[in-house]
Amino acid sequence: MPSPAPIEKHPFEPFLPEGARILFLGSFPPQPFRWCMPFYYPNWINDFWRIMGIIHFADKDHFCIPAEKRFDEALIRAFCTAEGLAFYDTACEVRRLHGNASDAFLEVVKATDVPALLSRIPQCDTLVTTGQKATEVIAATFGCPVPPVGEYIDLAMPARGTVMSSGSSVGPSASTISPSACTVMPGPDRASLHFWRMPSTSRAYPLALEKKAEAYRKLFTPSTNCAQKPIISSMLQSSG
């Protein structure tokens, strides 16, 4: 029987600054009444932007306007553009089975075509998931193992001009996802892609803010992000 919950479409456009090197993918934004700004990680009690403040400015409140309990969207957009940080989510249509923001009760109706997203930022070499649901969707899309929290695996990517298709079901809490349209990867050959699984920035995730920042700091440490790891061939099927 179909779920009675309404289908929600993603409220934001992908944020893909020119020259982006890191793509952050969450699951899906919370309901609008939880936002303090119309941008990614908009919930005032989500710590993503505090983590970025700690890592880059040694100040958890760098992107915060505490008196107004909101984040500084203009400052965040400028920072992400300068640093080459891209954002979207692994689902573009969902149902909230319990009417809340919990990943555990989020039914993925339509997954994001991640290869198509990557084709728009050809210099991106690092993909980061920020929660369990997002990690499951990416592992299913690329047919790869799930990395441990705070670690990454390298995915061998098809060469320039390869035609790819993606899509699969993502476990018992997700509906079957129809394969996406085939996508051509333009630009320079993307030999491999670092796939990082990071701890959730939600306060519900049982890890101290400082420990989360320690994990996320690895993304911005060249010796860590460029270390040699076994390369796992992507199972995206070529149709050309």
For each feature predicted by the language model, list its residue ranges.
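C-terminal capping/extension of enzyme domains
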Residues: 1-14, 18, 30, 42-44, ...
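Short, conserved, surface-exposed binding loops centered on an aromatic residue
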Residues: 15, 77-80, 119-120
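Structural motif
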Residues: 21-22, 126
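Catalytic nucleophile-elbow at a beta strand-turn-alpha helix junction centered on a G-D-S/GDSL motif
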Residues: 22-33
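Short hydrophobic-aromatic micro-motifs
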Residues: 23-25, 85-89, 196
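Short, well-ordered beta-to-alpha junction loops that form the rim of enzyme active sites
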Residues: 27-28, 129-134, 200
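Short, surface-exposed acidic-centric catalytic microdomains
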Residues: 33-106
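Internal catalytic-core helix/loop-beta-alpha segment
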Residues: 82-141
